[in-house]
Amino acid sequence: MKIWVDADACPGVIKEILFRVADRAKVEVTLVANHSMRIPPSRFIKMVTVPSGFDVADDEIVKRLDAGDLVITADIPLASEVIDKGGIALNPRGELYTVQNIKSILNMRDFMDTMRASGVQTGGPAAIGASEKQAFGNQLDRFVTKYHKL
């Protein structure tokens, strides 16, 4: 089991949580981004740099993903591909994407895109707060605990 991170848009505070978990639980965490990032020295933390371009990092994650791997992403279409391939998708706010909820989340995303395209100001998500960090950490701990029981 590996953890893949859609790192270009992943908040720094979430990466820090992942770095700590990688060493504590001895789980491989791989950041995938279109530019190099600073990562702590650890045999469990890796960086994959891909060329710039639309969905290049997403495509690389899907290509390398094995069933049962966890992907950290706020990209809903990527989360859908991860689920289709048998992976698990978690967003940085601690929301788990599942077979049961991904279609409705995709539909809402498409609706909001249509609203924005028609000129409606929808605003962006709020900054990640303490409750979202805790929700993310709790979901991550559940995943790692389940992995270690296998």
Swiss-Prot record:
Pfam families: DUF188. Belongs to the UPF0178 family. This is UPF0178 protein Ssed_1350.
